[in-house]
Swiss-Prot record:
Record protein name field: MRN complex-interacting protein
PTM statement from Swiss-Prot or TrEMBL: Phosphorylated; phosphorylation is constitutive and occurs in the absence of any DNA-damaging stimulus. Phosphorylation on Ser-115 is necessary for its nuclear retention.
UniProt biased composition (Polar residues): 87-104, 193-202
Coiled-coil segments: none
Cellular component per GO, a single term: nucleus
Encoding gene (name): MRNIP
Stretch list, region Necessary for the association with the MRN complex: 213-237
């Protein structure tokens, strides 16, 4: 019986593949894959044909895996580097975005506010800013209707007087405003003499009203000041008429009085007594604080009213003489009698 044929496992030098060949006496063999003829150098296994074929498959599989390892490693390294590059790029992009986001948001918030305000203004909605804590609340607006004049205190206002006053002689005097003048006009109803004007503010501001019940302005009240001749005027006596004659200016007579003049007095003294005894149209107001004395009973050098009384500040206005001359108070009370100094 013939022996079994043996086989060998050989490797080609050109294609680097493993293959099984039968054992022969010649040393030369040809590659089944690439067809290159080559000599026998090394046997990687020897046995039956089936065993050699299984062994060749295993060797070629391992050779293929080994050859694929560098490629895989290269691919893995390349992929890893690419991933790293991609990661670095992404990280850089994220950082750039993070850096750019604050600046963009900082500007965008103002733009959004402006756009919102513009939209609200377009729709007709307006907002009022709240006042800061430092700013005070605005006070009430100045009204032009309020008076700008200085307020008059009631302490300086004189006591009111009635509109219709009846003097001692029975003649009734009425108040009445006169156009173009700030004072009052007294009209005597029962007398035929003209009216006298009064510029003193004897009545209070509430009583100084005209026919239309209109208050006189404070300027008109201020202009109704007293006259410098008011202290020489005497209050009216009992009479039914008003004398409008002006008192004459008196001068002192340097010559001594004669025996005829001693009884009747000098003409100037008589004129002075007549002028002082004649009543005026001024109404005696309730401010008089002392009784009135006649011309002969008054002392020389003193007036009939005290300087501290309201008559010193303001009183009835007397019509001045056409040619006023300086007079002495002593001349107003000359009796015309001579007195001997030796007695």
């Amino acid at each position: 019986m013939a022996s079994l044929q043996r086989s060998r496992v050989l490797r080609c030098c050109s294609c680097r593949l493993f293959q099984a060949h039968q054992v022969k006496k010649s040393v030369k063999w040809t590659c089944k894959a690439c067809g290159e003829k080559q000599s026998f150098l090394q046997a990687y296994g020897e046995g039956s044909g089936a065993d050699c074929r299984r062994h060749v498959q295993k060797l070629n599989l391992l050779q293929g895996q080994v050859s694929e390892l560098p490629l895989r490693s290269l691919e893995e390294t390349v992929s890893a580097s690419e991933e790293e590059n991609v990661g670095h790029q992404q990280a850089g992009n994220v950082k750039q975005q993070e850096k750019s986001q604050p600046s963009e948001s900082r500007w965008l918030k103002y733009l959004e506010k402006d756009s919102q305000e513009l939209e609200l203004e377009g729709t007709g909605v307006c907002f009022s800013k709240q006042p800061s804590s430092k700013m005070e609340e605005p006070g009430p607006r100045f009204s032009q209707d309020l008076p700008r004049k200085r307020k008059w205190s009631r302490s300086t206002v004189q006591p009111p007087c009635s509109r219709g006053v009846q003097d001692s002689g029975g003649s009734e005097v009425a108040w009445g405003p006169q156009k173009g003048q700030a004072g009052l006009t007294w009209k005597v109803k029962q007398g035929s003499s003209p009216c006298l004007q009064e510029n003193s503010a004897d009545c209070s501001a509430g009583e100084l009203r005209g026919p239309g019940k209109e208050l006189w302005s404070p300027i008109q009240q201020v202009t109704a000041t007293s006259s410098k001749w008011a202290q020489f005027v005497l209050p009216p006596r009992k009479s039914s008429h008003v004398d409008s004659e002006q008192p004459r200016s008196l001068q002192r007579d340097p010559r001594p009085a004669g025996p005829a003049q001693a009884k009747q007095g000098t003409p100037r003294a008589q004129a002075s007594r007549e002028g002082l005894s004649r009543p005026t149209a001024a109404v005696q107001l309730p401010r008089a604080t002392h009784p009135v004395t006649s011309g002969s009973e008054r002392p020389c050098g003193k007036t009939s009213w005290d300087a501290r009384t309201p008559w010193a500040e303001g009183g009835p206005l007397v019509l001045e003489a056409q040619n006023p001359r300086p007079t002495r108070l002593c001349d107003l009370f000359i009796t015309g009698e001579d007195f001997d100094d030796d007695v």
